[in-house]
């Protein structure tokens, strides 16, 4: 990492000015959550937050300054209304007052798959100059919430972040922070990136990862495992297009296998999205099974089902990723922010055991070197 200045040094702002790409359910939960936790007591443990105050930044210090989408029902609309329109169907946790942030038309590129095309109407407004929009909004952090499979679009916005000198949080499974070429681009530009592919607070990936490690730590040979996921949001509808989902399967699989020493045959591990069930709305149901052998090679099997609201589950992690990116920007750090990426993302540049990644993140928060 490059040399840096301590957070809170002269020139570091008291706000975290955030722009969002993709005003879907995840963006909705994040925007609502900032409102929900405005008055959270930073001297107490607050349900739903790992850190009320992350370094110098309270949750309420996050301010939304720009948003980009391609949906005709969202472009030209105040962010506070856009998060509740079109196909967004996550649970409502807060009323959001007008933000005075109007959703702008971003470029489409490969951001819309065939199921999106059949479901939403694309805005006929010409795309804006994203770099100029980020600069004019004095953006600190750009969060990419593009649909799974948006390889070209995600890299376009990553380059915009570099050009605008804006920190980048890559919430989807397009490999940017974990790609050495892209990592060097961010490092050379002294622009921080936290990525790739956001973990949930307690989701299928983190629970599966922990249980696989538990088997290993307790001397149980994990022979085979699977994770099947169904949900009712646009993310799951989009992932019915299997050509768009390969990076997601890779990301979820390596998040589990990287936490154990065992090498799996391809047929012995299956992890990925399975189907779209419309009436689930933004809920996700995960079915996980681990099959192993314990003492005397006696079979030992574990099967569980996890039910979550998908988008709030990720918002509880992205709120820390955003503030970590801002601290890195304050300190002049360029390139992947390893402590935040390793703990908060499924496919970071460096996979670490969760307890080590968490300890490094806490050290990063208080680091004043």
Curated annotation (Swiss-Prot):
Coiled coil: none annotated. Disulfide bonds: none annotated. InterPro entries: MIPS (IPR052199), Myo-inos-1-P_Synthase (IPR002587), Myo-inos-1-P_Synthase_actino (IPR017815), Myo-inos-1-P_Synthase_GAPDH (IPR013021), NAD(P)-bd_dom_sf (IPR036291). One of its GO terms (molecular function) is inositol-3-phosphate synthase activity. It comes from the Bacteria. GO terms for biological process: inositol biosynthetic process; phospholipid biosynthetic process. Belongs to the myo-inositol 1-phosphate synthase family. NCBIfam families: mycothiol_INO1 (TIGR03450). This is Uncharacterized protein ML0396/ML2692. It comes from Mycobacterium leprae (strain TN). The lineage of its organism: Bacteria, Bacillati, Actinomycetota, Actinomycetes, Mycobacteriales.
């Amino acid at each position: 990492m490059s040399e840096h200045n301590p957070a809170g040094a002269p020139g570091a702002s008291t706000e975290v000015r955030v722009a969002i790409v993709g005003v879907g359910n995840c963006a909705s939960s994040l925007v609502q959550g900032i409102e929900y936790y405005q008055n959270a007591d930073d001297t107490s443990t607050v349900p739903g937050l790992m850190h009320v105050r992350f370094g110098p930044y309270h949750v309420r210090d996050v301010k939304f300054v720009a948003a980009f989408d391609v949906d005709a029902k969202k472009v030209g609309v105040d962010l506070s209304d856009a998060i509740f329109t079109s196909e967004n169907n996550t649970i409502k946790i807060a009323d959001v007052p007008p933000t005075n942030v109007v959703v702008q038309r971003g470029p489409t590129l490969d951001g819309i798959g065939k199921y999106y095309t059949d479901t939403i109407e694309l805005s006929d407004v010409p795309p804006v100059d994203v770099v100029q929009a980020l600069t004019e909004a004095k953006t600190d952090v750009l969060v990419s919430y593009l649909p799974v499979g948006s390889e070209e679009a995600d890299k376009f916005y990553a380059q915009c972040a570099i050009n605008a000198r804006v920190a980048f949080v890559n919430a989807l499974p397009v490999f940017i922070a974990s790609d050495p070429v892209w990592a060097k681009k961010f490092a050379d530009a002294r622009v921080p990136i936290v990525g790739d592919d956001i973990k949930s607070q307690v989701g299928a990936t983190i629970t599966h990862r922990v249980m696989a490690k538990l088997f290993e730590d307790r001397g149980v040979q994990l022979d085979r495992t699977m994770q099947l996921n169904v949900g009712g949001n646009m993310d799951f509808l989009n992932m019915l297009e299997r050509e768009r989902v390969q990076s997601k399967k890779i990301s979820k699989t390596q998040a589990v296998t990287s936490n154990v020493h065992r090498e799996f045959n391809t047929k012995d591990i299956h992890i990925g999205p399975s189907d779209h069930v419309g009436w689930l709305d933004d809920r996700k149901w995960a079915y996980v099974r681990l099959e192993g052998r314990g003492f005397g090679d006696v079979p030992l099997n574990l099967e569980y089902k996890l039910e979550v609201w998908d988008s709030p589950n990720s918002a509880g992690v992205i709120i820390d990723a955003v503030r970590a990116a801002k601290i890195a920007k304050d300190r002049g750090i360029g390139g992947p922010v390893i402590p935040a990426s390793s703990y908060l993302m499924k496919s970071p540049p460096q996979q670490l055991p969760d307890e080590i990644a968490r300890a490094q993140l806490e050290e990063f928060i208080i680091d004043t070197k």
